[in-house]
Amino acid sequence: MTATTSQPSPASAAAPNDAWLIRCCERGWLPDRLIRAGMRSLMRQRLRDEHAYDGERRAAAYDTLVRELGASPIAIETVAANTQHYEVPGSFFEAHLGPRLKYSCGYYPRGDETLSQAEEAMLALYAQRARLEDGQRILDFGCGWGSLSLWLAERYPAAQIVGLSNSHGQRHFIERCATQRGLTNLRIVTGNVVEFDFDPADTGFDRVLSIEMFEHMKNYGQLLAKIARWMHDDGKLFVHIFAHKLLAYHFAVRDDTDWMSRYFFTGGTMPSADLLLRFQDDVRIARQWWLDGTHYARTANQWLASLDAARPRVMPIFETVYGADARIWFQRWRMFYMAVAELFGYADGQEWGVAHYLFDKRRVLA
């Protein structure tokens, strides 16, 4: 496996080295096809640089990254990360995401699904792979705008669903949706995962599901230990992350050209497909799956098309949030979706993709 701890990430492919070019992109002076071509060029260079290393150097870099994660807090830059994606209100996401407001990869088994169909297909895939049943006590760890929590509450009326978010705005949004739909088996709690812990009387979850949350984390050992404490002895943890098949790296802001890290992923981590397997003191892997990157590329391209169509609805929202920079931020969100599409679509989806894991709680021997 390989890792880099100081070089720019491939997702920074939306960040050309020249700050002037970035300004041109952000102001919409360059056509999308040229912006996308620049992204692909930087991804290609990144992979070329990585594969130039010998095996010994790659292994050493990977071990260094694992040690760095183990010496870190559970998460860093939590305020910045929350602000970057959620300073805009739920109405922005309602304007252009699918009807479930799933702000993560969809599933396209045929390849021609609509965004709505891809949302439903992925949610159903979670239920299958996590081995969900009605009547279980289920935690949605990092519940976002409630796509999974609300879906679970609808599908499993006898289950007790708890969603954990670090955003009070998200909690109020989900609670309002639950009330409108007459759902009484869903509870949302808020807290920063670094400090948050459930009361022991409120633990014992049969299932914990986490969708594109671990990428915002650092110390996976501490995180998994905390989650394991929340689980029933026979409980299972299902994790969905985006990943590279081999590379693992930090999203870091070192200069103005670290565009993705600066505006959308401060403090984040790009895991490799097997990175979580290095942290099994408190959980044990039961199953692992891989979805190629074309699923996320389709998702992001559909988000982009929907965002463009919703521009008249979105711009007043952005003018309230971003003020005089509303037009620039509209283009930044477009570039973000283009970067996601190009990253996961690179090499027909055979470099970056989506990993699913099913973990058992590791039993403590008497």
Regions found by a protein language model. Name each.
Residues 234-242:
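Conserved beta-strand signature within the Rossmann-like core of class I S-adenosyl-L-methionine
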Residues 243, 249-351, 360-364:
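Substrate-binding/catalytic lobe of Class I Rossmann-like enzymes that use SAM or dcSAM, i.e.
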